[in-house]
Each structure stands twice: as C-alpha cells, then as structure tokens.
Amino acid sequence: MKTNREEILQSALQLFMSMNYESVSLQMIARSVGLTKTGIFNYYPSKLDLFIAVADRYLFHLQDPGNKFAPSDGSLRDFIDKYVEGVARTMDEIVRLGNIQREKMPGQLANAGYFHLFQQVLFYYPDGKHKLHEWMEKEFRLWCDVIGRSVGCGELREETDIQEAAALFRQVFIGLSYQMSFSDGLDVGILRKRFLYIYGLLKR
C-alpha cells in the first residue's frame, strides 16, 4: 500500500504533467488523494516544495544515468543495448504513472506531458536551468567515456572524434524522443536502429 507521501507525489506528478505550475493548487492535489490541504502541509509546506520533490524524484532521480542504465561490459555495442533497455524501462514507468489521467495530458499523451514537466522545471525549479544542464552534461560525459574506451581498445576507429560522436548519439535520442512524444511515444526499436547505424559508421 502506498504511503500518503507516495500518493501525494504521484498525484502531483500527474497534475504538473497535465497543467502549468501556476494552475496547480495544493487544494487540487489534496482532493485527488483524499487529504485536507492541512494534511499535505505535514509533508510539503508549500507548492514549490512539492514541485521540487516531484522533479527530484521523477525527473532527476529517474533520469540519472546511475539509476537508468545497467552496467555494461565496457564496449560501445553493449552500452547501446543497456542504454536502449534503460530508456524503455524508464519510459514505461513514466507512462504508468502519467497515464492514470491520460485524458488530461497535453496531446493526451504521458510522453508529451513529461516534456511539459521538463519545461516547467526550467522556469519554476530553483536554479532549474543549471540543474538540467548538470544532468545533461553527466549523460554526455558517460557517452564520451564509453566511446573513448571503445576507441582505446580498438572497437572503434582511432580517428573517431569522441565528443562529436557522443553528441550525435545524444541528439538522435533527444530529437527522436521529442518528435515521437506527440504520437505514441518513443519507439525504442527505431532508436536502437539509429544508434546501430551510427555505431556501424564508427566501428573499426
């Protein structure tokens, strides 16, 4: 059984994915979980505190590379498999949490609603721009590390530009995720196919 805190966070996530921050009230969240507004204050003293908790748990924690991807054997080929598996697992969790109120999502899709949450973090989360940059930079460095090792061990061509290759993988993922969020969500089969095409160009 979920604790009140978990219920509050999940209900708040659904509301912040489907509405702008300014439009969401603690009273709306309290009503959705069967608590009084005062009851929510026992967990979160303000709407901003609740929004920060939602972003920390369902964005920054869920998307952290250390939580999102299983360890690979060190090769880029295996990392691609682990990356796509981690993306699929995370996406399933987001859809599971968000689609409870699917009809209220922007475009009626949890995936589009999740991008909506990212945008709100940029504007309402304290120093959100810096925190988002740190998260993106962490994942970029992970790609650079894997590609660098793969060049060093001879898996990839020695003339591979490590940073450009890492940026290419990241931008394919971000671009495809955004484009497909307005239909049925990211197709991880297509993502894998695009990644393996890039891999084929880099492979020794």
Positions of predicted regions on the chain:
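Hydrophobic alpha-helical connector segments
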Residues: 53, 67-110, 166-169, 192
